Amino acid sequence: MDETITNKIKNLNIKWEYEPFPHTVIDNFLPSNNFKKISDNLKLINNFKDLKKNFSTHVEFNKKVYGDKDLSGELKIPVNILGSKLIKNIFEKFLNVKNMISLADWENYGGYYPFHSMNTGGVLGAHVDHSHSEDDLLHVANAIYYVSDKWDESWGGETFFSNDIGTKIVKKIIPKPNRLVLFIHSSQAFHGVNKISSPSDIKRNTYYMDYYIKDSEFIKMIDNQKKNIGKSLNYTHHTTTFIPLFPIGLKSFEIKFLGMKNTYKYILKYMQYLIARFIFGYQFSGFLKKLFTKKN
């Protein structure tokens, strides 16, 4: 990795904020010349072929997820950085854990690919991500790096953080070019993307990374949260779970949602999440997951 980039990251002044859950926002993350090369190369995004997912439901709309076959040269740099020990160290220090694992440590990123692009009309409703990887590592942190070459505040598209049940937006973060957002993930870390109203030729481009720990680090992490932020965050076992009828707050409800077939898929997952979080808890939901996995 470029020594200039390494030194810049090592000398970052990290200031954590704690509401609605721990996060930090870092502007001018990469040196300006590196960022310009990345954003300039992304102007060829319409030629990308390695499309993995294309979302078109009312809670996941106008969002495309790409693999890394198109991410050569400068475009691979953010993936390498976000998956590196440099960023892991920031999270490990905050959480008091060791041996953190990122998506970049797995073949095909564990199926959660690192480059996302959204365009006008796009929205990503309030949700919590999957709680565990396929091999049962606990998902504890996320990184989002904004790489559009320009973004006007009037275009929306903010990353938003919601209250701990996902029904009210508490904070919005503008996807400012060359801005990095790090946040601690838990079963109450509802987040999403506000509706985008950018010009049709302007895309909201981001790099994304998840971070995981072994269960053996769990108790130590919880104890550290109590000391550092005065409370422990909530963890249980669940898949990625959206707020099915109120994607960007209570006022976003539309009667047409009730007539959409996929709404009921989201409702089922949300009910499973609520039971796991508020009735079963971490240990028992984990026991049930292992029990049913063995049976299948």
Give residue spans per PLM region.
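Non-heme Fe(II) oxygenase catalytic core, chiefly the N-lobe of the double-stranded beta-helix
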Residues: L82-L138
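Non-heme Fe(II)/2-oxoglutarate
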Residues: E3-T4, N13-L95, L233
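Catalytic core of Fe(II)/2-oxoglutarate
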Residues: G121, S131-H139, S148-K294
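A structural signal for the main folded, soluble domain(s) of proteins
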Residues: T57-K64, V97-M100, H132-S133, S216
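Proline-centered turn/helix-capping motifs that create local helix->coil transitions or kinks
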Residues: N46-F48, K98-I101, S148-E153
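Histidine-centered active-site/metal-ligand motif
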Residues: H23, H127, H191
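Amphipathic alpha-helical recognition patches that constitute DNA-binding helices
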Residues: V25, P114, N142, T206
